[in-house]
């Protein structure tokens, strides 16, 4: 299995769900072993490069934000990262003229469409995988996420919300190639009772029914067209998990189980993995 990048650049415009700012984003091809690199094109006075790595994650409140040593940051990268993972793109340069990745429709599907339009190019370097060698678990109150050694990637994820519109949902997933058809179009969601508070804190400035599922205080789905799936909520949480795990630099080969996961928990798991060199190794496809 070889590494891959895009055949040609592809661009989009959109607003940030939290900043409310309109930005242009371009995904460009990159050389072998580059990984995923973000560049803030609106900043030229200092280092504007940020590697999409777990160790550059600086904030996990409602989304995943990465920063560099110069405190240049880009937020809400997880939906784009999930699309890159789902399309098996190992190397890409992402140029953006603002502080936040556009939310698009609240899912990864628009980014998947962009990548498919650009096309994929195989490269002259072997693809590497992060193989887990021992059990690793992170817990915060009643939320937990753990991974165990396994010969391929499989995920069992459960969410549990007090809202009757969501409730308890479970989903298992084991085929990366089915991400684009079954997970990528699951949208982010939020509660109207929290909107005023979030906006008072400078968050959710760009939120609308065009880019998120809205749930009111009577547990009613407010979007005119309803849900895309009965279990769209857990599908989106799985999407978030894949996007966050891709900040490891590659696909994780492990049996993963999560309960009430979050961006913070996802990132903590990667820190826990990489803090112990005996818990993982990078392998090629022939070594799986």
From Swiss-Prot:
Query: Which keywords has UniProt assigned to this entry?
Result: Hydrolase, Lipid A biosynthesis, Lipid biosynthesis, Lipid metabolism, Metal-binding, Zinc
Task: Enumerate the Gene Ontology biological process terms.
Answer: lipid A biosynthetic process
Question: Might you give the EC number(s) for this enzyme?
Answer: 3.5.1.108
Cofactor(s) required, per the database record: Zn(2+)
Top enzyme class: hydrolase
UniProt-listed Gene3D superfamilies: lpxc deacetylase, domain 1, lpxc deacetylase, domain 2
Q: Identify a single GO molecular function assigned to this protein.
A: metal ion binding
Its annotated pathway? Answer: Glycolipid biosynthesis; lipid IV(A) biosynthesis; lipid IV(A) from (3R)-3-hydroxytetradecanoyl-[acyl-carrier-protein] and UDP-N-acetyl-alpha-D-glucosamine: step 2/6
Q: Cross-referenced InterPro entries, in alphabetical order?
A: Ribosomal_Su5_D2-typ_SF (IPR020568), UDP-acyl_GlcNac_deAcase (IPR004463), UDP-acyl_GlcNac_deAcase_C (IPR011334), UDP-acyl_N-AcGlcN_deAcase_N (IPR015870)
Q: Answer yes or no on keyword Hydrolase.
A: yes
Record's protein name: UDP-3-O-acyl-N-acetylglucosamine deacetylase
